[in-house]
Swiss-Prot record:
It is a peripheral membrane protein. Keywords: ATP synthesis, CF(1), Chloroplast, Hydrogen ion transport, Ion transport, Membrane, Plastid, Thylakoid, Transport. It is found in: Plastid, Chloroplast thylakoid membrane. GO terms for molecular function: proton-transporting ATP synthase activity, rotational mechanism. This is ATP synthase subunit delta, chloroplastic. Belongs to the ATPase delta chain family. HAMAP family: ATP_synth_delta_bact. F(1)F(0) ATP synthase produces ATP from ADP in the presence of a proton or sodium gradient. F-type ATPases consist of two structural domains, F(1) containing the extramembraneous catalytic core and F(0) containing the membrane proton channel, linked together by a central stalk and a peripheral stalk. During catalysis, ATP synthesis in the catalytic domain of F(1) is coupled via a rotary mechanism of the central stalk subunits to proton translocation. This protein is part of the stalk that links CF(0) to CF(1). It either transmits conformational changes from CF(0) to CF(1) or is implicated in proton conduction.
Length: 180
């Protein structure tokens, strides 16, 4: 709940800035890159969330890791988050920004968590199936790998959850056996 309260104003401010500068597409691409980095690097997330690490160190790492891949305005926004002590909420801010940005373009976001990295073909197939199910013009996948799923994947889109994971099936069996 706290993450949402913090994430929404920053995401809305970044969206407003991107619209004012006619750079929504570039900013969305930048935030997508940031989001992928965070999804693939738990170490980076921990580093940014660690209150014992100085702001200058966090800024330096962000510049080194993302500086060449994202635009100057987005990097400045990240530095602002560091200065305000909100960089630990970057994942939530990025997700909320992408959600708002895509909503403006009639694009749905689906959080896909799988036990292994999905191939490009698997991603395409999932996106096509979700388009048919939701009726959305376009689907963007927010990918995450969680080996604890054992096998399969989960999809969160809107308020719906599709769980085809082995862990989910084991929970269902456990619940059924517990009810007997």
């Amino acid at each position: 709940m706290l993450v949402v309260k913090i994430a929404v104003p920053y995401a809305e401010a970044l969206l407003e800035l991107a619209n004012a500068n006619s750079s929504l597409k570039e900013t969305t691409n930048d935030i997508n890159i940031v989001s992928q980095f965070l999804a693939n690097s738990s170490d980076l997330k921990k580093f940014l969330g660690n209150p014992l690490i100085t702001r200058d160190a966090k800024k330096g790492v962000l510049k080194d890791v993302l500086g060449e891949q994202i635009g100057e305005k987005t990097l400045t926004f990240l530095m602002l988050l560091v200065d305000r002590g909100r960089i630990a909420y970057l994942d939530g801010i990025a997700y909320k920004f992408l959600e708002l940005s895509y909503k403006e373009e009639s694009i749905e976001i689906a959080k896909v968590t799988s036990s292994v990295q999905l191939s490009a073909q698997q991603q395409k197939t999932i996106a096509e199936k979700l388009k048919k199910i939701t009726g959305a013009k376009q689907i963007k996948l927010a990918l995450k790998v969680d080996p604890q799923l054992i096998g399969g994947f989960t999809i969160e889109i809107g308020s719906k959850l599709i769980d085809t994971s082995i862990r989910g099936q084991l929970k269902q069996i456990s619940t059924l056996l517990g009810a007997v």
